[in-house]
From Swiss-Prot:
SMART domains: HhH1, TOPRIM. This is Recombination protein RecR. Residues 79-179 form the Toprim domain. A zinc finger (C4-type) spans 56-71. Belongs to the RecR family. The keyword DNA-binding does not apply. May play a role in DNA repair. It seems to be involved in an RecBC-independent recombinational process of DNA repair. It may act with RecF and RecO. GO terms for biological process: DNA recombination; DNA repair. It comes from Mycobacterium ulcerans (strain Agy99). One of its GO terms (molecular function) is zinc ion binding. The gene is recR. HAMAP family: RecR (MF_00017). Keywords: DNA damage, DNA recombination, DNA repair, Metal-binding, Zinc, Zinc-finger. Gene3D superfamilies: 3.30.60.80, 3.40.1360.10, 6.10.250.240, RecR Domain 1.
Length: 203
């Protein structure tokens, strides 16, 4: 254990996902060794993120405006909506260059042990969005692209049940080929692109 601000820094870094005690200590001592202007730039960026980044009012993606750049882009196909768990999954799909629709971020997946169920996810917002015809466009297909793990599959099954009776709506699931138990963000572009292209109807 270190003392004072150094230990405080290690403790705060250790709260970040994927950062264990040793990694937190290593990062902390790296920060202590860099020049003050570098620290100033880092703190300035963190302040900008804290004060200027919000969630898109339409899809839930991270944005510095009311609408993210994808929802604001008139070239995107508003009739297609790809449902993902987290904003980082949008970047994974975008890297494939196979998809030109829009997105809906759930904010996670079912996890009963952590108390996450339908009410904690942005499922109600998805249903409202389908009914409201955003920008005057009917959503005709919802592509479910939750992670291929137990939580993601449970979430996908629930979504199918909620969406299957909506008139004129096709519900699809990205095709198999992604490793079971994996995260969408770690899939390579080719595999994920094929999974999107080969998506299967669920109803």
């Amino acid at each position: 254990m270190f003392e004072g601000p150094v230990q405080d820094l290690i403790d705060e870094l250790g709260k970040l996902p994927g950062i264990g005690p040793k990694s937190a200590q290593r990062i902390a001592f790296h920060l202590l060794s860099v020049e003050p202007p570098d620290i100033d730039r880092l703190t300035a960026v963190l302040a900008k993120v804290r004060d200027g980044v919000r969630f898109c009012a339409v899809c839930g993606n991270v944005s510095d405006d009311e609408r993210c750049r994808i929802c604001a882009d008139p070239r995107r196909d508003g009739a297609l909506v790809c449902v993902v768990e987290e904003p980082k999954d949008i970047q994974a799909v975008e890297r494939t260059r196979e998809y030109r629709g829009r997105y809906h971020v759930l904010g996670g997946a079912f996890d009963p042990l952590s108390g996450i169920g339908p009410e904690q996810l942005r499922i109600r917002e998805l249903l409202t969005r389908i009914g409201d015809r955003v920008d005057g466009v009917d959503i005709t297909e919802v592509i479910i692209a939750t992670d291929p793990n137990t939580e993601g599959e449970a979430t996908a099954t629930y979504l199918v049940r909620m969406l299957r009776d909506i008139p004129g709506l096709t519900v699809t699931r990205i095709a198999s080929g992604l490793p079971m138990g994996g995260d969408l963000e770690f899939a390579d572009e080719l595999t994920l692109g094929r999974a999107l292209t080969g998506r299967r109807a669920m109803v």
